Amino acid sequence: MSFPYSLKPFNTFGVEQSCLSLIEVHSKAELQSACLSLYQSKRPMLVLGGGSNIVFTDDFNGTVVRVLSKGISCSEDDTHFYLAVEAGENWHELVQFSLNQNMPGLENLALIPGTVGAAPIQNIGAYGVELCDICDWVEYLDLASGNLLRLTVDECEFAYRESIFKGSLRDKAVITAVGLRLPKAWQPKLAYGPLQSFTAETVTPREIFDRVCEVRSEKLPNPEVLGNAGSFFKNPIVSAATYMQLAARFPSIVGYAQPNGEVKLAAGWLIEHAGLKGFALGNAGVHAKQALVLVNLGHATGQDICRLALHVITRVNEVFGVKLEAEPRIMGLTGETSLDV
């Protein structure tokens, strides 16, 4: 079977796989039309944003729909700014836009790769802020009915790297636009690492933005130089009792207390202290500067990356008794599959 359309330019791991057909949509109407037609034909379909959260382990025997719809509209009331953003907008460019319009609140989420439409699926987050903190609504195409529907932030069932779009609406919905709600009474979020040196009373949104960009650029390799999908593993959440046991054995372990009493562990710390920082398996490697990131060292296949990920998961579990979970979607011949190759 022939797969004439290369997907290498459209996935940040730079994996060389192809697909049967490729459609680029530049408006919400085109996105609706293309996705409904494909859904009704019952052919495999993959809706792709920036390709920054995906690992292709095979050619895709179906149609890839690249979402390139653009548009940002702004409004406000006495207390909030509101942004309605089309799914194909670049996330980091949206962060820059909001700052330039003096609408702060997104600065902690600077330099997260990908599109706005992909952001709600895994409830993107960084440096103490998650999408759910600033999301107002999510509009999506209901594939079964063909209708555009809108969910409130509560209806999205957001959790750490989770949402209804990974749950009951998986494969049933295509996100078309996202609404954001930014308080005019801006309050800096400075709880995490490199932001703790700032003073809440004097820091500006631009200073936070610049620091986040600086730190991410230092730690995360440029995908155009070294293929990667950013953080490959979720930070595991454990009980307070488990954390205390681990801290007794590993006093320098990094953990962040959660509102419900559980503790979020730093997956990068676990990987590094399992001796895997800079480790390579074939053409896939654990990044030498940030162990949370897996990289394509040159001509790695999706299978290479998955094999390395499974090795990391096994080793961390052996050392710490903690099971890591992969963040990216693993795409096989006809659709999403599991990490096991």
Swiss-Prot record:
Question: Entry's InterPro entries?
Answer: FAD-bd_PCMH, FAD-bd_PCMH-like_sf, FAD-bd_PCMH_sub1, FAD-bd_PCMH_sub2, MurB, MurB_C, MurB_C_sf, Oxid_FAD_bind_N
Main location as per UniProt = cytoplasm
Name the catalysed reactions.
UDP-N-acetyl-alpha-D-muramate + NADP(+) = UDP-N-acetyl-3-O-(1-carboxyvinyl)-alpha-D-glucosamine + NADPH + H(+)
A UniProt-annotated Pfam family: MurB_C
Q: Name one GO biological process term.
A: cell wall organization
Q: What is its EC number?
A: 1.3.1.98
Extract one GO cellular component term from the record.
Answer: cytosol
* Highest taxon of source: Bacteria
- PROSITE patterns, sorted: FAD_PCMH
MF terms from GO for this chain are:
FAD binding; UDP-N-acetylmuramate dehydrogenase activity
Task: Check the record and name the Gene3D superfamilies matching this protein.
Answer: 3.30.465.10, UDP-N-acetylenolpyruvoylglucosamine reductase, C-terminal domain, Uridine Diphospho-n-acetylenolpyruvylglucosamine Reductase, domain 2
Q: Which metal ions or organic cofactors does this protein require, according to UniProt?
A: FAD
Query: Pathway it acts in?
Result: Cell wall biogenesis; peptidoglycan biosynthesis
Going by the UniProt record, its keywords in alphabetical order are:
Cell cycle, Cell division, Cell shape, Cell wall biogenesis/degradation, Cytoplasm, FAD, Flavoprotein, NADP, Oxidoreductase, Peptidoglycan synthesis
Q: Which residues form the active site?
A: 161, 231, 327
FAD-binding PCMH-type domain: which residues?
A: 15-185
Localisation per UniProt entry: Cytoplasm
Q: Which family does it belong to?
A: Belongs to the MurB family.
**Function of the protein:** Cell wall formation.
Name the record gives this protein: UDP-N-acetylenolpyruvoylglucosamine reductase
Record organism: Shewanella sp. (strain ANA-3)
